[in-house]
Amino acid sequence: MPRNHKEGLALDEKNGNTKYRDAEKLEMYQHAEYSTFKSLGKGSPGPDGDKKIRVHFVYDVKHASCHKVRLVAGGHLTDVPVDSVYSGVVLLRNLCICVFLAELNNLQLHAADVGNAYLEAETKEKVYIIGGPGFGKLEGHTLIIHKALFGLRSSGLRWHERFANTLLTWVLYLPRRILTSGCEGTAIYGSILPRTSTTLQLL
């Protein structure tokens, strides 16, 4: 597995393909779509008070030989933010409990995956980088990081806030019948619905 841009290109050349190069381009295209960076120009100094950090590509091969590259920030170079950096993760045990309760009460389960989830949230950390190899036209540019890039200390928290606020918006503005479809008159309707808004505020 390559450890950096140079090794990725060398491995592509050895294998006679461009899989890692293409994965890098796709990753950078997605950052352009999300407006992750704001360029101050090539060779420009960083903003006063902002911390200069490093970023690097992380390489992986997923199922069906799908090559994936993720741009990760060196968050260890920054000070610990004042606000909490904790963000919970789903435990298999908790997932099993949810499936059990759904089956017990004849409820439908729905699942979704948010691609590039962290990039949906904006970071509050004042950090910038210098675009390196693999950044294309932005190589050598001073780039302010606007989005919750993987590796930043508070990115998990920022995404958690973004997701919770989105769910709360749905609860407040979606028609009530959509939220309670199939549950009217049941114990689930009577016990869960009144607590929905309060629960989401705690997320």
Residue map of PLM features:
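Active-site palm subdomain of RNA-directed nucleic acid polymerases
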Residues: R162-L203
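Chromodomain-type histone methyl-lysine reader module
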Residues: M1-N165, T169-R176
